[in-house]
């Protein structure tokens, strides 16, 4: 059966010498794995059109099991995103988080809308690192945990100016007066905790102009990766590349 569906490539894996297996998140929010034969060959016409983040109309044959890709009518290749290693790495973290948050046959129109929102904001100039923070925040519950950033987990105080760390022992932000109860708490600014809470609660439809300074953004990213590792046992492949790029940048200074 010939199928035509709009979607975004969220995963691409080499298969043999010349083929790829791609996964698209289609417009209905379903993950569709497709065999892209000869996609690694330049002459096939599929090499450029089977990269991560390509948004297009995918035409494929589907009977039983995995479909076979015939062609892609590209709507947006997000070519500039693919040229920037840092930006593409954080965008890959977004795609990987969304992919791994969904079961094989699960349908999530929200995740499709979230990914479209992420890519459109990156195109407008919003840092991909910030978009990865939003995706990680919005998908916590899919990995079986939540995190609270708006009050002290020990004293209950709701004055966010007093919050200075996140405690894995008490599963939440903690205030300066309670810090002595967890010597291993992860220290970060109250501004970081405040903005994490805002981004966690705010619907993506209400997120317009997004601008967060780099040091706060770095604290957000570090904490969220720690949360996913501690509470869900998650290790992201794309984060490994991000860590390598950060080390290279530090070594070059």
Swiss-Prot record:
Domain of life: Bacteria
Keywords, in A-Z order: DNA damage, DNA recombination, DNA repair
Protein name as annotated: DNA repair protein RecO
Any Gene Ontology CC annotation: bacterial nucleoid
Biological role stated in the UniProt entry: Involved in DNA repair and RecF pathway recombination.
Organism listed in the record: Staphylococcus epidermidis (strain ATCC 35984 / DSM 28319 / BCRC 17069 / CCUG 31568 / BM 3577 / RP62A)
Similarity comment: Belongs to the RecO family.
HAMAP family: RecO
């Amino acid at each position: 059966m010939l199928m035509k569906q709009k979607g975004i490539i969220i995963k691409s894996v080499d298969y043999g010498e010349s083929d790829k297996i791609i996964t698209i998140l289609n417009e209905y929010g379903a993950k569709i794995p497709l065999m892209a034969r000869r996609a690694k060959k330049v002459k096939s016409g599929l090499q450029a059109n089977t990269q991560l983040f390509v948004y297009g109309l995918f035409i494929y044959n589907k009977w039983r099991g995995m479909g076979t890709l015939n062609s892609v009518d590209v709507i947006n290749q997000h070519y500039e995103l693919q040229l920037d290693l840092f930006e593409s790495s954080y965008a890959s973290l977004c795609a990987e988080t969304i992919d791994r948050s969904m079961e094989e046959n699960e349908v999530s129109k929200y995740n499709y809308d979230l990914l479209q929102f992420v890519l459109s904001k990156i195109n407008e100039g919003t840092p991909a690192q910030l978009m990865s923070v939003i995706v990680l925040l919005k998908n916590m519950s899919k990995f079986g945990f939540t995190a609270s950033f708006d009050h002290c987990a020990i004293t209950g105080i709701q004055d966010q100016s007093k919050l200075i760390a996140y405690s894995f022992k008490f599963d939440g932000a903690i205030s300066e007066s309670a810090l002595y109860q967890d010597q291993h708490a992860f220290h970060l600014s109250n501004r970081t905790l405040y903005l994490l809470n805002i981004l966690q609660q705010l619907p993506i439809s209400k997120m317009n102009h997004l601008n967060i300074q780099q040091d706060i953004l770095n604290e957000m990213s570090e904490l969220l990766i720690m949360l996913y590792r501690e509470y869900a046992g998650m290790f992201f492949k794309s984060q490994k590349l991000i860590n390598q790029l950060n080390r290279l940048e530090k070594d070059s200074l």
